[in-house]
Structures are given as C-alpha cells and as structure tokens.
C-alpha cells in the first residue's frame, strides 16, 4: 500500500477530533481493503510471539471508543514519538470500531517495527458478529467489509515478550502452556477455537479466590490463581504478566503480589461504567508507570450490538467483563 494513501488515512482519522467528541470518518471500502490486506501481510511476517524491547507503552481494551484512543495518543505521544503495544479488543461495544481499528492498522503499516497489535477475544467473527462490529460494518459499509476485517484479525499475533521479562497477552495463562515455543507455533491464519491454548491466551482470567485452575464465569476457558502466576514466572524466568480483558476501576490493577497486571484503556466503558482507563509505560530499566485517562462525568449513549443501551456488571476489584 502506498505510503501516501496510509498517510492520508491517518491524517483524516486524526482530523476527526471535534472538541471532546470525534466525527465519523467514512473511509472508502477500497481503503479498508488495502489497510487489511497490507497489515495482514505484516502480521504474518512477524512472529506469533512478538519479541519487543523497552521503552514501550502498553494499552488494554479500547472497544471502539475512538475519542479515547486519540486521548491515549495525546497522553503518550503520537507514533512514532513512542513505541506502542495494544493488547486487543479494538472493536465492539463502542460506536466507532471502524475508525479505531483503521487508525491502528494504518499506524501498524507505517511504523511496523515500533507499533504492535495483539489479538483480543473480540477479534473473532463469532464474538464481533454479536457485540456490535458486524452491525456497524453492515450499517456503514457491507457484510463484505466485515469479512475483510475478519480475514485480517485471523492473522494477528497473540502474545509479546518484552526484553525476555514481561509476557503480554489479552487474556491470560493456559494449563496447556508449558513452553513459550508453543505460542510461537500456533498456526495462522486461525479462527479462535472454543478451548485450548489459543482460546485460553485470549479468554482466561486471574482469580484471587482460588488456587490452581478454576471454572470461568464467562463459560469459556479458565480462571487461575496467584500460585499459577508465580509458578509460571519462576519456570520461565519472567518478571511480570501483562494482560487486559477485564474492566478495572482505576484502569490498571495488580494481582499475585504485583506479578500480574491488568490494563484496561476504555474509560467510562460502554457509557455505563465509571472506570478510568490506563496506559502502562515500560522504561529502559523495565520500570512500569501508569498514565490514567480519568472517567468523564457524562455518560453517553453508546454503540451497536447486543449490549447497546443496556447496563452491564459494575467494575469491581478483580475486574468486570471486558
């Protein structure tokens, strides 16, 4: 894809900011197709377990909250001023999933060695068919466009290792994960199965009330106790697991004696919660600090799909559903 086309897409998307809101930006179907096919090729040339270096900024779920994505870049610096890793869940629930994913794909194409995207459980046809992205694509474009995005999502990497010490994924650990090579060897393109390693990396959750592995309230994958985090870090000589996938009140929350952190980057999630959003900055010495997007007072009318206009579970210590 020609650089000038990507530059133009980025310029138009960044130009959507209109005070505290963002205007809709209607890219052409041809532009979306170019973004998806170009990004897909880049994803497949890079490993499924990315090996990255600090300094880097890590963001959790954004869920179509495009104005908040722009706020993250205002806080952290627009690429390439900083390196970024996003932990998935770019689409669904919010009302500007198309703009959100298109800006992220455009940045990935333009700065492929400095800007990284992992797959979340919502980058999956069976999930985003229900929770809003399909409806947004169909209303604004066509079902064909949704399928183009699906093909791209099936090629996203699923985990990242920062300086061989911080392991990042969307969901969490898996009882099937014994060696990091098992992540490297997950084939792509792939749909997300309903069980197994790929499923767990995108769906599992920590649970402070259990030891070992437990049933997950989501009806998919497992929960895991602090003992499993400690055991995994010791076995693989790691310092920290960094994941997203759950709404947490302050935008970030530690678990297992600060050996795992949850990051969630969509403040006022779904227009219903009072949660803050956060971004984690990892410096050269692997010291982690947090930048917070405060929750706004006003709760807007949100989005497309199954949960539009419906209250969810309030964020709790330990996290609501992401």
Curated annotation (Swiss-Prot):
Cellular component terms (Gene Ontology)? cytoplasm; nucleolus; nucleus; protein phosphatase type 1 complex
List of residues binding Mn(2+) 2 = 89, 121, 170, 245
Q: What class of enzyme is it?
A: hydrolase
Q: Does the keyword Secreted apply?
A: no
Annotated EC: 3.1.3.16
Against SUPFAM superfamilies, the record matches this protein to: Metallo-dependent phosphatases
Q: How is the cofactor bound?
A: Binds 2 manganese ions per subunit.
Q: Which Pfam families match?
A: Metallophos (PF00149), STPPase_N (PF16891)
Please name the GO terms that the record assigns under molecular function.
metal ion binding; protein serine/threonine phosphatase activity
Locate the compositionally biased regions of type Low complexity.
304-316
Q: What is this protein called?
A: Serine/threonine-protein phosphatase PP1 isozyme 3
Q: Which organism is it from?
A: Arabidopsis thaliana (Mouse-ear cress)
């Amino acid at each position: 894809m020609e650089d000038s086309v990507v530059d133009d897409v980025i310029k138009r998307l960044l130009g959507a900011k209109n005070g505290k809101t963002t205007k809709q930006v209607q890219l052409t179907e041809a532009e979306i197709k170019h973004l998806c096919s170009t990004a897909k090729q880049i994803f497949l040339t890079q490993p499924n377990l990315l090996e990255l270096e600090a300094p880097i900024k890590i963001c959790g779920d954004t869920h179509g909250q495009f104005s908040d994505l722009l706020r993250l870049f205002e806080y952290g610096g627009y690429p390439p001023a900083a390196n970024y890793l996003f932990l998935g869940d770019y689409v669904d629930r919010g009302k500007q999933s198309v703009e959100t994913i298109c800006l992220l794909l455009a940045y990935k194409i333009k700065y492929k060695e400095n800007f990284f995207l992992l797959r979340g459980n919502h980058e999956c046809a069976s999930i985003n068919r229900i929770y809003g992205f399909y409806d947004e694509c169909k209303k604004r474009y066509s079902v064909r466009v949704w399928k183009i995005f699906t093909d791209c999502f099936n090629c996203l990497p699923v985990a990242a290792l920062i300086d061989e010490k911080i392991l990042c994924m969307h969901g969490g650990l898996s009882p099937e994960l014994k060696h990091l090579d098992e992540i490297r060897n997950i084939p792509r393109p792939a749909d997300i199965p309903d069980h197994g390693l790929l499923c767990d990396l995108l769906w599992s959750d920590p649970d402070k009330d259990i030891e070992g592995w437990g049933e997950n309230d989501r009806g998919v994958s497992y929960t895991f106790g602090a003992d499993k985090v400690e055991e995994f870090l010791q076995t693989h000589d790691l310092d920290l697991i960094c994941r997203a996938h759950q709404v947490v009140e302050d935008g970030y929350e530690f678990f297992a004696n600060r050996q795992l952190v949850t990051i969630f980057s969509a403040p006022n999630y779904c227009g219903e919660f009072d949660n803050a959003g956060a971004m984690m900055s990892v410096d050269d010495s692997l010291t982690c600090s947090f930048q917070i997007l405060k929750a706004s007072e006003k709760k807007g009318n949100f989005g497309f799909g199954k949960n539009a206009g419906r209250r969810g579970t309030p964020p709790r210590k330990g996290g609501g559903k992401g």
